[in-house]
A protein has these predicted regions:
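Eukaryotic scaffold repeat domains enriched in small/polar residues
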Residues: 1-268
Length: 268
């Protein structure tokens, strides 16, 4: 996030970086385009989708999802730059984006607990298709839908962070089930039928009984089978991984906002 927790005043710093396995930078882009870069997804064609979770109308930035080519060329924008709203053409502090295998696009919209709290679905060309969700704690309702993932059956997983659960939906918004044993989900991903959840907020007074870190669930059983604790055990502000990814060798990567680091946890 431009060396801090947002990009305001840091227009010279790139936002997206591609590294090789040794950590060397291969590509970087996005300088001067974002207020608060938040969620990221890479589609099957290698295009990079980045969410800007805050906005400023005067600067004409934010409240958008931007699609880049692998080289950093802007291909598509969802939402109206700098304009917050809840319409077919506006977003308000979107959190995450996910592209389905058929090209459909899902956006988790609404960072505040009392915000938009909806999932918006678009066609691959950016046409609005549908949406579902409102503020609440019933099935299909949200309080900060912070992260998205999709399993091999095409089910959509939503990290409903302030409700301390994962909700699962069909792609038309039909509720399937939910989980309450994964903490406060800031980032989620699915690999080899395992659900990985980055919980950056469970700490003293915030989510009693849970610790910050990355939890791993076996989706066949619904049981948590592994836990990677936050490397920083102190109970201060958010420092643990907010984003999580897994490579083909099973190594787990945590995107840590506080330390401004990408930490690799090697599979054994």
């Amino acid at each position: 996030r431009c060396g801090e927790n947002n990009c305001v005043g840091h227009d010279d710093l790139d936002v997206v970086f591609q590294f090789d396995k040794q950590g060397r930078i291969l590509t970087q882009f996005g300088a001067g385009m974002f207020e608060w870069p938040h969620g990221i997804d890479v589609d099957d064609d290698g295009n990079v989708w980045v969410v800007d979770a805050r906005g400023n109308e005067e600067r004409g930035r934010g409240h958008q999802v931007i699609k880049f080519s692998p080289e950093g060329v802007v291909l598509l924008r969802l939402g109206t730059a700098g304009v917050a709203g809840r319409t077919r053409t506006t977003l308000d502090q979107p959190n995450d984006v996910l592209t389905a295998p058929n090209g459909d696009i899902f956006v988790a919209d609404g960072h505040p607990g009392n915000g938009n709290n909806r999932i918006v679905k678009y066609a691959s060309d950016g046409r609005y298709l549908m949406e579902w969700g409102e503020t609440g704690s019933n099935p299909g309702e949200f309080r900060t839908p912070h992260a998205l993932a999709m399993d091999d059956d095409g089910l959509l997983y939503v990290g409903d962070r302030s409700n301390r659960r994962i909700q699962v939906f069909e792609q038309d918004g039909t509720f399937v089930r939910d989980f309450y044993n994964m903490g406060r989900a800031s980032g989620i991903t699915i690999h080899n039928n395992k659900l990985y959840v980055a919980d950056s907020e469970s700490r003293y007074g915030s989510n009693p009984g849970f610790r910050r870190g990355i939890r791993v669930m076996d989706l066949d059983t619904g049981f948590v089978i592994a836990f990677i604790p936050d490397p920083d055990p102190t109970p201060g502000g958010t420092s643990a991984a907010e984003g999580v990814a897994v490579d083909n060798e099973g190594n787990v990567y945590g995107a840590e906002v506080g330390p401004r680091a990408l930490r690799k946890h090697v599979a054994r």
